Amino acid sequence: MNITATMGQYYYALIIDAASKILVWMDASMYGNGIKLTEHSYVGNNFVSTFEFSLSPEGIYHKSRVVWAGDYADKEPEQEKNLHEQCDEYKLIRPAEKKTTKYRFVVNHTKKQYADKSKWEMHPLPLLTAEGNGRGGGDIHDAPPCVGSWARDVISIEESLPDGEDFEEVVFE
């Protein structure tokens, strides 16, 4: 993992619909964190825990489409802005801080994959859903192919893996 000190790319965590329209978004700085990817992407971070709680069975956005939208990401098709740049036009939410220690698995229902948080040095949710990674400081450069591979997929946070379905584990290598 190579983290370079260049101009920083800033990220917002988004819930989007199937057409990639923003439903709600969150800003890490509202929780006292930096908004570069590596400034808040670790297990136990209060911002990431609060966002992922919304994706848990207890949360309002369980099994939703997620993207960690970077401000250097590509523009949306047939639009003048990328998702990060569009955020001001949509609802910013700031839920009360939540802990998610009982939720061990980040599950991708679109790709039938999962990440076991106990096996990751950094938090898998922001890394796997990052869009625009590698284009700014605070990003993960020379990243493995899994980084960003879950952007815009249906994600949930679970205590255990879904019954009756085969899910493939994703690891950070």
Which residues does each predicted region cover?
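Short, extreme N-terminal segment that most often corresponds to the first beta-strand
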Residues: 2-32
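Low-complexity intrinsically disordered segments
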Residues: 37-173
